[in-house]
């Protein structure tokens, strides 16, 4: 009976969160598709150059949201509602402060950021426009991530999913309207993206009006330990998102030297396509997180292990399905983002996908196990896994392998890195098994 209960709860949380994350990945793909159709290879290159800043904004939002919501879920399972509300208040304050910093950065420093990220020639103007608008919507991204995580951990994954899907599909519709009928170019693309968290927040506000939430704004004084607790748990989410931006930046630099802007556009096709699979893995991990944190809070080890087992099995099945889809439909997938029918871009994207996507089997496992460690307050293993796969191993691996095997070496760096980190993750789990 307990086993059925564990599986039922996991299926409910994970499936709803995966649906929401698929929606997010679809709007990222739609963004790339519409930009490719409307602005060609230069537009896709500008979009890819700006990704590190998006990763930073989304990463800090998840750091606050996941870190705060994990502590909130633990306190809630222990019946400590006042402590949970203090965590929420501190998280909200952090989101507002960081959002204001992003807004000011976008308003006054978008051009230096564009050039620092490697924008050159015809893509500088488009990258600057994209970054300016993206950063000025920073407060909404931070608040959306924070509220989404807290509401999901307060027992309402359905509303969390509804908000994510509504924001994502609104972005897809607005993308088309702004880029094509209204001919707003790259500004239209990022305006659609910026409005997405605004729309999502409108949906999430329903939760507050219903007055069913367990978290409230309270007077908070001398909350240094609360801030530390949020950051120590949430930094794993920040590193995950920020690392993806660092990897994109490093890969862009390497590929620019090997194959120019066309090579970067080919990498954009691969990176944006892989976002779908990674988003599903993240959805599984985030779906299991409230259950793991609550079980950890009351010391229910059977539930902890059951949720981890279901997460890993789900991840392996998804990885196999995605890889088979890539193997059989490589050409049409690459062609979707190659609106100018550039032969070299098509060839590089096809070759890269077949190699790059072998890493999914290991990356999914690493995402699941690092999230498991973070949700159960095992900070060192969680951060070590995330840092290794995020940039400490993959960036030098990409530089070394590109020297040895050119562009093929760049594509191989991802699966090789994820395999090594998966082996290390297993060692961490075995060493911590008696504590789990």
Residue ranges, per PLM feature:
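Hydrophobic transmembrane alpha-helices of multi-pass small-molecule transporters
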Residues: 56-59, 171-175, 200-205, 275-279, ...
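Transmembrane helical elements of multi-pass membrane transporters/channels
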Residues: 12-31, 133, 144, 167, ...
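Short runs within selected transmembrane alpha-helices of multi-pass transporters and secretion channels
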Residues: 65, 133-152, 160-171, 189-204, ...
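N-terminal transmembrane alpha-helices
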Residues: 2-39, 52-67, 71, 96-103, ...
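Helix-terminus/linker motif at the lipid-water interface of multi-pass membrane proteins
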Residues: 26-45, 114-121, 177-184, 245-272, ...
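Small-residue-rich hydrophobic transmembrane alpha-helices
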Residues: 44-104, 141-160, 266-330, 363-382
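Transmembrane alpha-helix boundary and packing residues in multipass membrane permease domains
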Residues: 17, 21, 33, 70, ...
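Short alpha-helical transmembrane segments in multi-pass integral membrane proteins
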Residues: 1-17, 72-137, 183-235, 292-358, ...
């Amino acid at each position: 009976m307990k086993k059925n209960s564990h599986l039922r709860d996991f299926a409910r949380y994970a499936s709803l969160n995966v649906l929401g994350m698929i929606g997010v990945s679809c709007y990222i793909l739609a963004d790339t598709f519409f930009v490719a159709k409307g602005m060609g290879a230069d537009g896709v290159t500008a979009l890819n150059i700006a990704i590190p800043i998006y990763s930073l904004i989304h990463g800090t939002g998840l750091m606050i949201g996941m870190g705060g919501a994990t502590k909130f879920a633990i306190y809630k399972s222990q019946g400590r509602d006042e402590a949970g509300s203090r965590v929420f208040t501190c998280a909200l304050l952090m989101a507002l402060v960081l959002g204001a910093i992003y807004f000011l950065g976008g308003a006054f420093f978008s051009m230096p950021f564009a050039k620092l990220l490697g924008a050159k020639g015809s893509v500088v103007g488009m990258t600057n426009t994209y970054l300016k608008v993206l950063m000025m919507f920073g407060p909404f991204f931070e608040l959306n991530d924070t509220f989404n995580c807290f509401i999901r951990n307060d027992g309402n994954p359905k509303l969390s999913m509804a908000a994510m899907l509504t924001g994502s599909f609104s972005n897809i519709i607005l993308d088309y309207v702004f880029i094509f009928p209204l001919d707003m170019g790259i500004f239209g693309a990022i305006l659609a993206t910026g409005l997405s968290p605004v729309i999502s927040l409108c949906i999430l506000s329903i939760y507050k009006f219903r007055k069913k939430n367990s978290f409230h704004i309270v007077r908070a004084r001398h909350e240094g330990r609360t801030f530390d607790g949020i950051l120590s748990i949430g930094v794993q989410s920040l590193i995950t998102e920020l690392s993806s931006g660092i990897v994109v930046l490093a890969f862009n630099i390497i590929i620019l030297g090997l194959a120019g802007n066309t090579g970067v556009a080919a990498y954009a096709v691969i990176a944006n396509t892989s976002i779908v699979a990674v988003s599903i893995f993240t959805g599984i991990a985030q779906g299991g997180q409230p259950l793991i944190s609550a079980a950890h809070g009351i010391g229910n080890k059977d539930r902890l292990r059951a949720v981890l087992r279901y997460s890993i099995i789900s991840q392996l099945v998804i990885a196999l399905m995605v890889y088979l889809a890539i193997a059989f439909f490589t050409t049409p997938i690459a062609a979707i983002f190659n609106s100018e029918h550039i032969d070299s871009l098509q060839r590089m994207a096809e070759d890269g996908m077949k190699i790059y996507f072998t890493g999914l089997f290991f990356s999914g496992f690493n995402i699941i196990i690092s999230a498991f460690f973070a949700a159960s307050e095992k900070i060192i293993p969680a951060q070590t896994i995330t840092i290794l796969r995020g940039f400490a191993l993959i960036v030098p691996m990409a530089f070394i392998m590109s020297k040895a095997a050119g562009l093929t070496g760049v594509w191989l760096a991802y699966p090789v890195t994820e395999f090594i980190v998966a082996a290390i993750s297993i060692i961490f789990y075995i060493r911590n098994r008696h504590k789990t």
